[in-house]
């Protein structure tokens, strides 16, 4: 369970993670684009940031040859964390936008509202 970031802070609607995972910067950007295209207006907050570097070695490298180069960046997402928030649009529009964004993440998510009700 997450230590913080489990409640909506900025928007009226949000997308909550239901499992633990590493989310890459490409997945976050893909979800952002999907939401931006479907919203048409309103405000979007991305509540996670890819601040952890994942390093790799080439195939020809031997063991014990150092740390390796940064391959990509990930955000560590814990169960219960709010991933994205939206405000300034009707609930139907926000729900559809979050549904499109949920496909981009490697974890199950749930659409939530500020009223504390779990929507669909």
Give the location of each predicted region.
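Ribosome-associated RNA-binding proteins
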Residues: 1-120
